[in-house]
UniProtKB/Swiss-Prot annotation:
Keywords on record: Acetylation, Activator, Apoptosis, DNA-binding, Nucleus, Transcription, Transcription regulation
Protein name from the UniProt record: Cysteine/serine-rich nuclear protein 2
A Gene Ontology biological process term: positive regulation of transcription by RNA polymerase II
DNA-binding recorded as keyword: yes
Main location group: nucleus
Entry similarity comment: Belongs to the AXUD1 family.
Biased composition (Low complexity): 31-40
Gene giving rise to this polypeptide: CSRNP2
InterPro entries for the chain: CSRNP_N (IPR031972), Cys/Ser-rich_nuc_prot (IPR023260)
């Protein structure tokens, strides 16, 4: 090792010429360090001295060894390499430190020599294939043991069975991997008597480490258990769960996470191609020289060229956007689908509430609870309302606005409305309750509506002028449906006819009691048979 280091240092020192600028600069530095050196207190006596900078060394003129009329080939003896990793086994091949022979060829001689060597290698390869075919024929594809097949060698294959002259040499690849036995034979033929056996174990460990890439995490990465985090490298995700299986939100690697983004790669590619094509078009349509006067036709052509460049730029942008739209990764699509599914419930709630003419308030209205007791016949709203909120159901016909009061909010001044305050009460008509019968042919049974114990609201019919006036006369007794009717409604109509109050929203279903005491759900729309709704999609709430 010392001899190798010494030879390397000697070569570096030999490269430096004696009369180079490096030696001159050293002499100048040594002379400047002497007692005769000048400083700010002792000005120089001679102004002809101009020291050269050590940073500006002159380039040494070296003889160029590259020649294009001949080929020089250096031949090395084989040694155990310790630098390559074969696909199987050990005994890697290498070269000696110094070459043992040198030979020069012309271009034609080198081409002929290469063809001869390739044909010789091809002849040996065809012999091996012919020998393998004979062994398989004697053993019947390896199913029968044959002593004759075990004794066959390459010398048993004649050259007459192989036609190498009519084979195109350029159609073959000659840098083929060699098996372990062949590598060991080549090393022994080159004079290597002792082959290191420890290299086999090292090569095996390297191959196993190359087969394992990424961490074994699934969706979540624990920094203490993640192999990438322990190694101090980032998690790499080329596609879904490969090579690392962590997700974007669940990766806890302290070094970070890299995800292959095909959209970014495609965008970069399109932008690069666009810039190159625009640059080539600018070079083709260069402006006239400065000494020449620009003619009107030239200016028109230049304007047309700029317009065509702008049009081409817009076309490239459109193609880029189209390509980006079709390059969504699988993980991105799944994430968007999950977001749509999570937001689907809230969207369906908003649409159902809007169809009922309902407004959800964050804070309850200032109405005393004792003035508005609960009703015996609740109204069913098939929507999932958040607990603790207030609901306003505005009237469909508000042709007679009333004067606004001082203490009432602004949204109470537009006309009569129905106010629902969400409270915690047991639901009337729980699933499986006895005594419930089928109300209408167009609606499912009440027990099939899947009504569960959820927050219940109390019905309050209020007016914009006096929200509590309607409830004052009914304190101490249960209000009825006739008490909540406006004055313009006739209460003396027959009970068997459908009742449609003007203050109820058109699509708001309400419940009345028939003569048999069974609850029946009806709607305010006339002459319209509503199909039964799927109870699994919308959960009805009793309010």
């Amino acid at each position: 090792m010392d001899a190798f280091t010494g030879s390397g240092l000697k070569r570096k020192f030999d490269d430096v010429d004696v009369g180079s600028s490096v030696s001159n600069s050293d002499d100048e530095i040594s002379s400047s360090d002497s007692a005769d050196s000048c400083d700010s207190l002792n000005p120089p006596t001679t102004a002809s001295f101009t020291p050269t900078s050590i940073l500006k060394r002159q380039k040494q003129l070296r003889r160029k060894n590259v020649r294009f009329d001949q080929v020089t080939v250096y031949y090395f003896a084989r040694r155990q390499g310790f630098t390559s990793v074969p696909s199987q086994g050990g005994s890697s091949l290498g070269m000696a430190q110094r070459h043992n022979s040198v030979r020069s060829y012309t271009l034609c001689e080198f081409a002929q020599e290469q063809e001869v060597n390739h044909r010789e290698i091809l002849r040996e390869h065809l012999k091996e294939e012919k020998l393998h075919a004979k062994k398989m024929k004697l053993t019947k594809n390896g199913t029968v043991e044959s002593v004759e097949a075990d004794g066959l060698t390459l010398d048993d294959v004649s050259d007459e069975d192989i036609d190498v002259e009519n084979v195109e040499v350029d159609d073959y690849f000659f840098l083929q991997p060699l098996p372990t036995k062949r590598r060991r034979a080549l090393l022994r033929a080159s004079g290597v008597h002792r082959i290191d056996a420890e290299e086999k174990q090292e090569l095996r460990a390297i191959r196993l480490s190359r087969e394992e890439c990424g961490c074994d995490c699934r969706l979540y990465c624990d920094p203490e258990a993640c192999a990438c985090s322990q190694a101090g490298i980032k998690c790499q995700v080329d596609r879904m769960s490969f090579p690392c299986g962590c997700s974007r939100d669940g990766c806890g690697n302290m070094a970070g996470r890299i995800e292959f983004n095909p959209i970014r790669v495609r965008t970069h590619y399109l932008h690069t191609i666009m810039k190159l094509e625009l640059e080539s078009k600018r070079q083709v349509s260069r402006p006239a020289a400065p000494d020449e006067e620009p003619s009107p036709t030239a200016s028109c052509s230049l304007t047309g060229a700029q317009g065509s460049e702008t049009q081409d730029f817009q076309e490239f942008i459109a193609e880029n956007e189209t390509a980006v739209m079709h390059l969504q990764s699988a993980e991105e699509l799944e994430r968007l689908k999950a977001e749509e599914d999570s937001s689907g419930s809230s969207a369906s709630l908003d649409s159902s509430i809007e169809s009922l003419g309902v407004c959800i308030l964050e804070e309850p209205l200032a109405v005393p609870e004792e003035l508005c007791p609960g009703l015996t016949a609740p109204i069913l709203i098939q929507a999932q309302l958040p607990p603790g909120s207030s609901v306003l159901c505005f009237t469909e016909n508000s042709d007679h606005p009333t004067a606004s009061t001082v203490n009432s909010p602004s949204y109470l001044n537009s006309g009569p409305l129905v106010y629902y305050q969400v409270e915690q009460r047991p639901v009337l008509g729980v699933k499986g309750e006895p005594g419930t019968e089928e109300g209408s042919a167009s609606f499912p049974k009440e027990k099939d509506l899947n009504v569960f114990s959820l927050p219940v609201t109390s019905l309050v019919a209020c007016s914009s002028t006096d929200p509590a006036a309607l409830c004052k006369s009914e304190v101490g007794k249960t209000p009825t449906l006739e008490a909540l009717l406006p004055e313009d409604c006739n209460p003396e109509e027959p009970e068997n006819e459908d009742f449609h109050p003007s203050w109820s929203p058109s699509s708001l279903p309400f419940r009345t009691d028939n003569e048999e005491g069974c609850g029946m759900v009806k709607t305010s729309q006339q002459n319209e048979d509503r199909p039964p709704e799927d109870s699994s999609l919308e959960l009805p709430l009793a309010v």
